[in-house]
């Protein structure tokens, strides 16, 4: 019998007997474990050989045998749990232990650095699965970060300073306002072994031509080996940065024929996906990466949904048994905000917008929040922390306003917390707030109508590029805010847009109402080096490393 199955049987027997040694019979024990008398005898003999118990059998009708436990079920369960943790089999761990609080405690105790068979392993605890990692699809903040570890693009943006750097393309030049040329590295390999070809690059960029920010790409050709020419329908000063974004990352041209590509993608980046389930994401350093090989050999993201009910204030890399330390913290470049839907009567009503902006002001939300959230929330008066565009002006409740509908995407605990506070405040004004949770894909597409949407945005460096790029690429915003997005995109591409003024107009019209800036925190080990928190609340895995202990 496999060891794991035998351990489960022993734990069950120990629990049924309440851990007490006793006089009993094979028939009674077989009934407890719902098995045959013969199988029960085999189990007892095997468990005795393992040193877990002794079985002193008595022969004869009416005689009772002696069962003595030498090992406790709890100790064996702990040993089994430790084995499962080392093997990263979190789903089986949850089934074995059962108690969610105990599972969480065990996971936390194993976070951070592990050194196994000469490999450095980093373990991270997260609250939800990361199942969709497909560039060009609707990706949330953490999926965006993970995709950058798996894929490469023609260019890349330095997360620390926002500067443009070479990636698959080692140089590029603007030949004319409508013509750019990129020079690509040879010898780049995908994780599944095949060498990258120009057809992969061309196919990857053509597949995103339907996205708003890439719709001005007219043609992509390769005039000579490892040279790529991109022709545009309108000038774009941001094109090199645009080609470093996640939608423009390079996929193998046969990606649609590869099994479960969205959850098990294949790229050319520093890490390759080894496992991606509802309980765990495991990525491993790619030895044939064309850049510097990652210093951390393996990153395990353990998924424990139960921690979603806690304030989402930090990325936990190290458990409390060690020297837990706040490594970095920063106020996010972005905010939670309300989006009014101009497609509904109440969402388009300026009086409703003004009054909701007044009663659901950032200070009101923070005031009514629990202390654990107050420590992480900062009132927002603009889309960025440095902006003060919003003004809270006293406004009268519109006559006849009795209800409003608020919609947000699911699997985000703070959405529920903020919505609950809003519901409480509006109820005090005799307004019922109907709350709807939908999938992230539904939220992103924005085909459903709602009076108000509760959203969040995290902008990456450089901000003068990413702020408009982020807002423009979310279809929901284009559905809700009736402005000429294409004309604004053309001005942005030409460098003619005053971004601060453009955002101020959105806030002044109450199309978007900033609510809260969130403190992002990473907790980890003192021995970790090269860790620089990015604006998504994560860090570049390939640049981090563990310092060895002092000799």
Curated annotation (Swiss-Prot):
<comment type="function">
    <text>Activates the small RNA gene sgrS under glucose-phosphate stress conditions as well as yfdZ. Represses its own transcription under both stress and non-stress conditions. Might act as a sensor of the intracellular accumulation of phosphoglucose by binding these molecules in its C-terminal solute-binding domain.</text>
</comment>
<feature type="DNA-binding region" description="H-T-H motif">
    <location>
        <begin position="26"/>
        <end position="49"/>
    </location>
</feature>
<dbReference type="InterPro" id="IPR023767">
    <property type="entry name" value="Tscrpt_reg_SgrR"/>
</dbReference>
<dbReference type="InterPro" id="IPR039424">
    <property type="entry name" value="SBP_5"/>
</dbReference>
<dbReference type="GO" id="GO:0003677">
    <property type="term" value="F:DNA binding"/>
</dbReference>
<dbReference type="GO" id="GO:0045893">
    <property type="term" value="P:positive regulation of DNA-templated transcription"/>
</dbReference>
<protein>
    <recommendedName>
        <fullName>HTH-type transcriptional regulator SgrR</fullName>
    </recommendedName>
</protein>
<keyword id="KW-0238">DNA-binding</keyword>
<dbReference type="InterPro" id="IPR000914">
    <property type="entry name" value="SBP_5_dom"/>
</dbReference>
<keyword id="KW-0010">Activator</keyword>
<dbReference type="GO" id="GO:0045892">
    <property type="term" value="P:negative regulation of DNA-templated transcription"/>
</dbReference>
<dbReference type="GO" id="GO:1904680">
    <property type="term" value="F:peptide transmembrane transporter activity"/>
</dbReference>
<feature type="domain" description="HTH marR-type">
    <location>
        <begin position="1"/>
        <end position="116"/>
    </location>
</feature>
<dbReference type="GO" id="GO:0015833">
    <property type="term" value="P:peptide transport"/>
</dbReference>
<keyword id="KW-0804">Transcription</keyword>
<keyword id="KW-0678">Repressor</keyword>
<dbReference type="Pfam" id="PF00496">
    <property type="entry name" value="SBP_bac_5"/>
</dbReference>
<dbReference type="Pfam" id="PF12793">
    <property type="entry name" value="SgrR_N"/>
</dbReference>
<dbReference type="InterPro" id="IPR025370">
    <property type="entry name" value="SgrR_HTH_N"/>
</dbReference>
<feature type="region of interest" description="Solute-binding">
    <location>
        <begin position="163"/>
        <end position="492"/>
    </location>
</feature>
<keyword id="KW-0805">Transcription regulation</keyword>
């Amino acid at each position: 019998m496999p060891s794991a199955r035998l351990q489960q049987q022993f734990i069950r027997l120990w629990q049924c007997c309440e851990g007490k040694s006793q006089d009993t019979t094979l028939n009674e024990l077989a009934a407890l474990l719902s098995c045959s008398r013969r199988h029960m005898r085999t189990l007892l003999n095997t468990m005795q050989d393992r040193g877990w118990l002794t079985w002193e059998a008595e022969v004869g009708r009416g005689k009772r045998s002696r069962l003595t436990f030498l090992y406790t079920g709890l100790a064996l369960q702990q040993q089994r749990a430790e084995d499962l943790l080392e093997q990263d089999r979190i789903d089986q761990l949850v089934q074995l232990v059962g108690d969610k609080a105990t599972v969480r405690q065990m996971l936390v105790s194993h976070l951070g650095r592990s050194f196994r068979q000469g490999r450095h392993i980093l373990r991270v605890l997260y609250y939800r699965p990361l199942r969709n990692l497909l560039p060009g699809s609707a990706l949330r903040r953490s999926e965006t970060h993970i995709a950058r570890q798996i894929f490469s693009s023609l260019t890349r943006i330095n997360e620390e300073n926002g500067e443009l750097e070479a990636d698959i393309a080692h140089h590029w030049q603007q030949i004319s306002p409508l013509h750019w040329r990129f020079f690509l590295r040879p010898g780049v390999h995908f994780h599944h072994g095949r060498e990258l070809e120009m057809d992969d690059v061309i196919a990857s960029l053509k597949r995103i031509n339907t996205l708003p920010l890439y719709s001005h790409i007219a043609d992509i050709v390769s005039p000579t080996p490892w040279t790529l020419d991109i022709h545009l329908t309108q000038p774009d000063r941001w094109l090199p940065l645009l080609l470093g974004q996640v939608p423009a990352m390079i996929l193998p041209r046969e990606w649609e024929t590869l099994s479960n590509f969205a959850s098990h993608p294949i790229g050319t980046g520093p890490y390759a996906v080894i496992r991606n389930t509802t309980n765990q994401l495991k990525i491993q350093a790619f030895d044939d990466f064309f850049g510097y090989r990652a210093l951390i050999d393996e990153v395990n993201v353990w998924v424990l949904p139960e921690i979603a009910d806690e304030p989402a204030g930090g990325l936990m890399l190290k458990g409390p048994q060690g020297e837990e330390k706040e490594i970095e913290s920063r106020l996010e470049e972005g905010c939670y905000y309300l989006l009014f839907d101009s497609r509904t009567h109440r969402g388009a009503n300026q009086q409703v917008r003004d009054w909701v902006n007044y009663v659901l002001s950032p200070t009101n939300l923070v005031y009514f929040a629990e202390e654990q959230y107050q420590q992480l929330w900062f009132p927002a008066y603009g889309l960025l922390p440095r902006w003060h565009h919003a003004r809270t002006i006293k406004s009268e409740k519109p006559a006849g306003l009795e209800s409003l509908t608020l919609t947000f995407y699911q699997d985000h605990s703070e959405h529920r917390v903020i919505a609950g506070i809003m519901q409480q405040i509006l109820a005090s004004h005799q307004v019922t707030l109907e709350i709807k949770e939908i999938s992230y894909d539904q939220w992103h597409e924005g085909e459903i109508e709602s009076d108000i949407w509760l959203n969040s945005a995290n902008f990456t460096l450089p901000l003068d590029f990413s702020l408009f790029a982020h807002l423009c690429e979310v279809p929901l915003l284009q559905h809700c805010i009736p402005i000429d997005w294409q004309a604004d995109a053309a001005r942005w591409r030409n460098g003619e847009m005053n971004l601060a003024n453009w955002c101020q107009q959105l806030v002044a019209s109450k199309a978007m109402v900033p609510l809260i800036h969130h403190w992002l925190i990473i907790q980890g080990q003192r021995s970790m080096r090269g860790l620089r928190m990015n604006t998504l609340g994560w860090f570049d895995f390939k640049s981090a490393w563990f310092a060895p202990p002092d000799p």
